[in-house]
């Protein structure tokens, strides 16, 4: 297992085998959600497992799930899942997007992408397949191979089911696809229920308009039919479906800003207010919720956006895409967005959706997935350190000790991307003998400052000399014993 992953070593196999027995007795009950059990004072096996992974008391996990500040996306039909948590009390998580497009990929290719994403540390994976393949086949293959929660956007398949015809798409089509995804084991679904018909005029004046694919589909539907968003009017029906499978809402932000100019505008904030209403409606059904957020946001507006979401949505976990803090770096948007992601995580965002270097340019390949995930694992980890989460800095300290001791193999092992670290070291010093060397190619064998090995004992001796010579014109010479 690569060190980028958040799975606890030694715990990644047993839960996948055991979870079928955990959920067997729950099947057929009217409500099998983790929130439902938590509100009854029950610590489920999933909650207990999450507590171990997060180094948190089981009682705290149960309380946070009951309160809605933490979710455990874990559909009862996804039995090979290793349960994980998303919430402000847990470590900041990272999602990776995969999915077949009309122009590329198939089920086997998507499973390869899934395995790559998990290898490089994805805590959840979203299947954003839009067509050109058998979507049910792709989704079933992904869920069957995934130890991490899988999310989907059902409106894509709803539109595909009527061959892309907005005029033929009706309310029941949406609900049929939503339940199908639940039956297949999808752990969370992006439901764009917060976009109301009265919000659409607020988009006037934007540079990039509506940039959410799901939101765009629903906007077209409302404009064509002159009716309210069916995902809003049928929201309670969706809650009834979700609680039978313990599928979690990821409330979609259809009006997220697609550029710096559009950030924090009236359209975005109007939808956010509705998302808060929907969060509380879902909680009345004991259904778990996280809320999606922007997008493209200037650095100085990120804290406002996080705090506003917490206020409007009663502290339901926040899940953001980036945000990108500038729009002028196509090809480097994994960097422009990781900057914003680290800040968003520091201010309390619970999960970060990765962005790859191909964002705005094309479909990412394997190298792009790797680059995007590592950038976001860095951002999430930086946020964990800044929020002083239990044990967050332990690996940093361990790697720093290995660095000071010139233990190159230990440094590689502890890296987020060991392969890259070793590759860069070996470009100039490839021989095995250099894995014991007390230098790298930057300073060479004579100029590394860490070779001096000034010890605490040396410094304590210096302190005594300084104290003894307080006020003296000259200091007594101090001899420092260097390590062998």
Swiss-Prot record:
Cofactor annotation comment: Binds 1 [4Fe-4S] cluster per subunit. The cluster is coordinated with 3 cysteines and an exchangeable S-adenosyl-L-methionine.
Gene Ontology BP terms: thiamine biosynthetic process; thiamine diphosphate biosynthetic process
Cofactor: [4Fe-4S] cluster
Keyword Thylakoid set for record: no
This protein's UniProt keywords: 4Fe-4S, Iron, Iron-sulfur, Lyase, Metal-binding, S-adenosyl-L-methionine, Thiamine biosynthesis, Zinc
Domain of life: Bacteria
EC numbers: 4.1.99.17
Binding annotation for substrate: 97, 126, 156, 192, 212-214, 253-256, 292, 319
GO MF, one example: zinc ion binding
NCBIfam families: PRK09284.1 (NF006763), PRK13352.1 (NF009895), thiC (TIGR00190)
Physiological role: Catalyzes the synthesis of the hydroxymethylpyrimidine phosphate (HMP-P) moiety of thiamine from aminoimidazole ribotide (AIR) in a radical S-adenosyl-L-methionine (SAM)-dependent reaction.
PANTHER family per the UniProt record, alphabetical: PHOSPHOMETHYLPYRIMIDINE SYNTHASE, CHLOROPLASTIC (PTHR30557:SF1), THIAMINE BIOSYNTHESIS PROTEIN THIC (PTHR30557)
Protein name: Phosphomethylpyrimidine synthase
Protein's organism: Synechococcus sp. (strain CC9605)
């Amino acid at each position: 297992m690569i060190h980028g992953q958040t799975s606890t070593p030694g715990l990644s196999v047993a839960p996948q085998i055991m979870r079928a027995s955990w959920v067997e007795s729950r099947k057929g009950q009217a409500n099998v959600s983790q929130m439902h059990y938590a509100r009854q004072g029950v610590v489920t096996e999933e909650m207990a497992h999450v507590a171990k992974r997060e180094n948190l008391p089981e009682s705290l996990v149960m309380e946070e799930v009951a309160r809605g500040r933490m979710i455990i996306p874990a559909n009862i039909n996804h039995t090979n899942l290793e349960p994980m948590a998303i919430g402000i009390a847990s470590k900041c998580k990272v999602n990776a997007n995969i999915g077949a497009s009309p122009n590329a990929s198939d089920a086997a290719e998507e499973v390869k992408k899934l395995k790559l994403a998990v290898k490089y540390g994805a805590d959840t994976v979203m299947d954003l397949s839009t067509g050109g393949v058998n979507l049910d086949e792709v989704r079933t293959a992904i869920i069957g191979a995934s130890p991490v929660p899988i999310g989907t956007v059902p409106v894509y398949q709803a539109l595909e089911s009527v061959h892309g015809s907005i005029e033929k798409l009706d309310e029941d089509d949406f609900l049929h696809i939503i339940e199908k995804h639940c039956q297949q084991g999808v752990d969370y679904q992006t439901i764009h229920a917060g976009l109301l018909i009265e919000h659409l005029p607020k988009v006037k004046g934007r540079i990039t308009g509506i940039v959410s694919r799901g939101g765009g589909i629903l906007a077209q539907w409302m404009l064509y039919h002159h009716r309210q968003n069916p995902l809003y009017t049928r929201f309670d029906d969706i809650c009834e479906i979700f609680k039978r499978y313990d599928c979690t809402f990821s409330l979609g932000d259809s009006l997220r800003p697609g550029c710096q100019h559009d950030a924090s505008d009236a359209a975005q904030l109007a939808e956010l207010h509705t998302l808060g209403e929907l969060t509380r409606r879902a909680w009345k059904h004991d259904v778990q919720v996280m809320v999606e957020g922007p997008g493209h946001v200037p650095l100085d507006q990120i804290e406002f956006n996080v705090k506003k979401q917490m206020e409007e949505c009663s502290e339901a976990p926040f899940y953001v895409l980036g945000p990108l803090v500038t729009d002028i770096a196509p090809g480097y948007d994994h960097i422009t967005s990781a900057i914003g992601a680290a800040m968003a995580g520091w201010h309390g965002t619970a999960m970060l959706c990765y962005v790859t270097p191909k964002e705005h340019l094309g479909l990412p390949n394997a190298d792009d997935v790797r680059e995007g995930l590592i950038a976001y694992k860095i951002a999430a980890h930086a946020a964990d350190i800044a929020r002083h989460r239990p044990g967050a800095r332990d690996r940093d300290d361990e790697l720093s000790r290995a660095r000071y001791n010139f233990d190159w193999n230990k440094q590689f092992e502890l890296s987020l991307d060991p392969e890259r670290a070793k590759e860069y070291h070996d470009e100039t010093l490839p021989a095995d003998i250099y894995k014991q060397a007390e230098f790298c190619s930057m300073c060479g064998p004579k100029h590394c400052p860490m070779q001096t090995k000034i010890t605490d004992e040396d410094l304590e001796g210096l302190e005594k000399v300084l104290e003894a010579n307080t006020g003296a014109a000259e200091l007594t010479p101090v001899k420092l014993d260097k390590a062998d």
